[in-house]
Amino acid sequence: MAMPDPLTEVDRAISEIRRGAVVRVYDEHNSLLMLAVDALSADYLRLLTQSGTKMPKLVMTGTRVNLLGIDKSDRPVSVLSHPEGISLDLIEYLANPLAASMMPPSMASLEVKDADVLEQSCVTLAKLARLLPAALIVEANATADIPAVQASSIRSYMTIAAHSLTQVSEARVPLENAENARVLAFRPRDGGIEHLAIIVGDLNPAEPVLVRLHSECFTGDLVGSLRCDCGNQLRGAIGEMATAGSGILLYMAQEGRGIGLVNKLRAYQLQDAGFDTVDANLQLGFDSDERNYLPAAQILRLIGVNRVKLMTNNPAKVTALGNCGIEVVERVPHIYPSNQHNDAYLKVKAKKSGHLF
């Protein structure tokens, strides 16, 4: 019997948990049923309980657990359980910071332990699905007839998807500030989300190419949000490349520093409640930056570019791209004036994320 394709089985699992269904996550030793907290419903919770062998447990990032004051260890992922089971109210309070206005349920008798690799994979799957990084899990019955995904496939998904990227289309697209421009689309083997490369002018791969890694930003790029500087950076980068004669802007499907648009809007709501851009992500249970730069590096290699002048204010991008095998010969500052809505945001990026302005 042929082994399942890792990308295909992860994509199917993502589709299932995004609609609130239960999936089975397994390795060579154990098998868990998983239900994403973000899509929790009474019917599927009942199915999870009936299909398992024990009471469901909650698995979530150590970051979120620490911020709740439940545990102060350095666990990357924690498993929370209660002898009588975790109530729906408690699940919502623990996993969703936007439920913090509720009266906190009693957390007496709540037990916390390290998550093993299989349990950690459930949180990773929720992140891949762009859901809150929390899941209900229960040991699976051997006969459970539920869509299944290997934990090893979840862990390797990002790497395999990046290496499977291929160019699927290209068109000449004259732009406002760069009439000589082309847009190339790249898709992973599983038919997942596409990334784009905007090539301005005629490249000379023998020389370091001016490159901007730009994470898609619906609010800033498309509708002109003043909460960030993304729109200015997008259009400014294209104009600077046209002035320089050539360049590549990689438009990466990594909204909200990799957490997705829905979670970014949640982070905005938390910012309105007083958290800064970094702490809002942490409150949701994410890292301050969830982006993976391997897809960007792979696209550059497919275009034939291995040496770049990177247009960024973020030294972490320079390091990350270098770790992915692309030589960054120069960091090119990319600074635009702030406004009353994003001034604090930019200052936090400088103070907490090391951006250089």
Place the predicted regions along the sequence by residue.
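Catalytic domains of riboflavin
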Residues: 1-357
